[in-house]
């Protein structure tokens, strides 16, 4: 069966190297690997002249000249200059091999947090037993407890209100469909006294704080005892609640399931996404005192102010490059480790961050909501529209340091600078070839001299005669 380049036929590794037998998930990765066997070694070390098939191999080779300790991955043999980078890289192997299966449907997930979210959304616990008084549903074991606590014996089915009746709280705007719900809610507005036996039953013996429910008191007591029953399998950190553990695990996996529909930016928590969306709605209460720019979140203002002060508190341990935000450093580290955990289900292309994947998916869907008011051209993200509008305004802010040419945005400058790099590489290759040919034809003991004036004139005459 023919498979389009770059698209995996299955989730296995169907593309095998005919030389060493190593398998790959995508054909493009196999082609890059085969360069090492085929002698296509375009990257040359300036110190010793050794050539490598990939830029990453050349970078590892140069560490040997610096006398730097190398950390080798036992799974694939890739080398790293720092142990922290090796740890990040090993996570890619763990996620591939130790997937988490769902016991109910068999679907597999790369990490525990994704499995937990799947079970909550797709397999919620069955609650077939409905309360006849308030219409709430419970598992069989929880229904008797609910009836005894929320509906005392004096409550009967005959006196139950119609479902459309609402019970309003006199202390706040909230309303409830049952008197029991209002009763439970009203406890948060009452400061219990020491003479109240109900308050005494749910009072903390350590600090004296009272609670309306025994389950709330139990969770509170865990703070005093230091008990944290929900442990992170990655780092061992404990948490009081499973929901907090799920949010913490996203710091290990980099998972950001909440995406902004306007700009593609992703967040690990829904509350952070809601705060971010204020910026698209015009709400920017946090103002920079230096330039007057507004932000929807205070943290975004703090990160922005570092652009004025030059502060970059998050340096890369591999190349020393500094970043204003920890998340930017995390994404940058993946360029060293080669980790691309997010892949497109349609074409197999992989990405270092989920926001780039979301933007890429818009290209498949043809969704380009950002339209230029000048020419009508549409773009998938607002940042590309902003760059495009500079061409209408005639702004050229990106300058090439080699030739002084200006460009309207950084991508055009990067493409232009590649031409300088290609020219330098071609000149270096030509110099190397000339040196090799000279040594082979003349020999080390002879001295190469230029042609005499008479030879030059004869050469010119012969060349002219050949072309006529």
Swiss-Prot record:
Record-level GO cellular component terms: nucleus
Q: What is the lineage of its organism?
A: Eukaryota, Metazoa, Chordata, Craniata, Vertebrata
Q: What does this protein do?
A: May be involved in transcriptional regulation.
Q: Where are the zinc fingers (C2H2-type)?
A: 15-37, 43-65, 71-93, 100-123, 129-151, 167-189, 202-224, 230-252, 258-280, 286-308, 314-336, 342-364, 370-392, 398-420
Name the UniProt key words of this record, in alphabetical order.
DNA-binding, Metal-binding, Nucleus, Repeat, Transcription, Transcription regulation, Zinc, Zinc-finger
Q: What is this protein called?
A: Zinc finger protein 672
Name its GO BP terms in alphabetical order. Answer: regulation of transcription by RNA polymerase II
Instruction: List the Gene3D superfamilies.
Output: Classic Zinc Finger
Q: Name one Pfam family in it.
A: zf-C2H2
Q: What is its main location?
A: nucleus
Q: Please give the Gene Ontology molecular function terms for this protein.
A: DNA binding; zinc ion binding
Asked if Ion transport is a keyword of the record, the answer is no
| InterPro entries to which the protein is assigned, alphabetical | Znf_C2H2_sf (IPR036236), Znf_C2H2_type (IPR013087)
Record family assignment:
Belongs to the krueppel C2H2-type zinc-finger protein family.
Task: State the signal peptide span.
Answer: none
Q: Where in the cell does this protein reside?
A: Nucleus
């Amino acid at each position: 069966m023919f498979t389009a380049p770059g698209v995996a036929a299955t989730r296995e590794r169907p593309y095998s190297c005919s030389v060493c037998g190593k398998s790959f998930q995508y054909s493009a990765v196999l082609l890059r690997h085969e360069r090492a066997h085929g002698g296509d070694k375009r990257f040359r070390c300036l110190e010793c002249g050794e050539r490598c098939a990939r830029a990453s191999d050349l970078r590892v080779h140069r560490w040997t000249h610096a006398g730097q300790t190398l950390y080798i991955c036992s799974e694939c043999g890739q080398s790293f200059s720092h142990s922290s980078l090796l740890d990040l890289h090993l996570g890619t192997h763990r996620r591939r091999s130790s997937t988490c299966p769902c016991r109910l449907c068999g679907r597999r997930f790369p990490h525990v947090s994704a499995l937990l979210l799947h079970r909550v959304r797709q397999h919620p616990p069955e609650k077939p037993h409905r309360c006849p008084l308030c219409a709430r549903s419970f598992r069989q074991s929880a229904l008797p407890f609910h009836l005894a606590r929320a509906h005392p014996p004096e409550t009967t089915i005959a006196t139950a209100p119609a479902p459309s009746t609402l019970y309003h709280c006199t202390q706040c705007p909230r309303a409830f469909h049952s008197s029991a719900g209002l009763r439970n809610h009203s406890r948060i507005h009452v400061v219990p006294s020491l003479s109240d036996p109900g308050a005494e039953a749910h009072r903390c013996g350590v600090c004296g704080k009272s609670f309306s429910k025994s389950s709330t008191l139990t969770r509170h007591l865990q703070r005093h005892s230091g008990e944290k029953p929900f442990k992170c399998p990655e780092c061992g950190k404990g948490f009081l609640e499973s929901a907090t553990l799920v949010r913490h695990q996203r710091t290990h996996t980099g998972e950001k399931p909440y995406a902004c529909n306007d700009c593609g930016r992703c967040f690990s928590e829904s509350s952070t996404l809601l705060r971010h969306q204020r910026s698209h709605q015009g709400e920017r209460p946090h103002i920079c005192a230096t330039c007057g720019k507004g932000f929807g979140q205070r943290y975004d203002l703090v990160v922005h102010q570092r652009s004025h002060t030059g502060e970059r508190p998050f340096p890369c341990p591999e190349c020393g490059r500094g970043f204003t935000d920890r998340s930017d450093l995390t994404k940058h580290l993946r360029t060293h480790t080669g980790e691309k955990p997010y892949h497109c289900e349609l074409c197999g292309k992989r990405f270092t961050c989920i926001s780039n994947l979301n933007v890429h998916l818009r290209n498949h869907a043809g969704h380009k909501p950002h339209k230029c008011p000048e020419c009508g051209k549409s773009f998938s993200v607002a940042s590309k529209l902003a760059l495009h509008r500079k061409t209408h305004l005639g702004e050229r802010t990106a300058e090439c340091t080699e030739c002084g040419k200006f460009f309207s945005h950084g991508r055009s400058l990067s493409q232009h600078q590649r031409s300088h790099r290609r020219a330098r590489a071609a000149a270096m290759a030509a110099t190397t070839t000339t040196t090799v040919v000279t040594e082979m034809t003349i020999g080390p003991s002879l001295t190469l001299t230029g042609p005499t004036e008479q030879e030059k004139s004869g050469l010119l005459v012969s060349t002219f005669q050949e072309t006529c």
